[in-house]
Amino acid sequence: MTRLLDAGATIIGKSTCEYFCFSGGSHTSAPAPVHNPWRMGYSAGGSSSGSAALVAAGEVDLAIGGDQGGSIRMPASYCGIVGMKPTHGLVPYTGVMPIELMIDHTGPMTASVSDNALMLEVLAGPDGLDPRQHAGRESQPYATLMKQGAAGLKIGIVKEGFGWPQSLAASDDKVRKAAQVLAGLGARLEEISVPMHLVGPAIWLPIAAEGATQQMMKDNGHGFNWKGLYVTSMVDFHAGWKARADELSETLKLTMVLGEYFIQHYRGHFYAKSQNLARQLRAAYDSVLAD
């Protein structure tokens, strides 16, 4: 917020999100379901449902969302706006309720790509308070770089990202057609293989379920030995859930039951293994991106 205000933005309010951000739909928020602005009664996606709906409806120019497993990208897709999940640590997460340090991302949601680039330029860069920013990536002139267009860009099409049993063939087709549009603008397409991409969801699950159960819920978002800024008001406010656990959403209850089962029966083994495998997966992506 501070960076946006310093850049001249006006803050008009807070958007509704899904209950504790644990839903990919738009039906679990505390006040009421968030309707898709293009058609009442249809999902706006989640968990940053309100942010996407407000931008799509033209109520705001810019909004901020959080993304641990699609929560910026899915509502952006459902509502027809541009949602950016930045590289981990590029945008400081300071002041946002943590879910799990390893997978916490926050980023811009806008009506256009140019607005998204400009907003990212304002938001990005170290703040000295967020331990996710250990690499210290600086902001870049994204809005200026965007004007160079797609000509000369080399785009890798990960073949393991297509043909999943649970994915829609129409969605796969849309992605490939979008790539061809970029090729028509001068980008170079290359099909690449990242075999470990196939186990990404299995790596993510213990980190999300066990990590969120422990860090977000039991430790009120921070816990002990936190290297970043403690937002004490957030810690105090969040702790109230323990006296009202019956009011938690069904999606969050399910996640906590799963996370607690793993913790009780496997003592963090699969969480630790997933963290180690995540490093290997990141290295696999970095390897192909280096080309």
Segments (PLM) and residue ranges:
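Gly/Ser-rich catalytic/binding loops embedded in alpha/beta enzyme cores
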Residues: 1-68, 151, 158, 177-180, ...
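Alpha-helix boundary recognition
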Residues: 5-6, 55-56, 73, 217, ...
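Generic anion/oxyanion-binding catalytic loop in active/binding sites
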Residues: 43, 105, 263
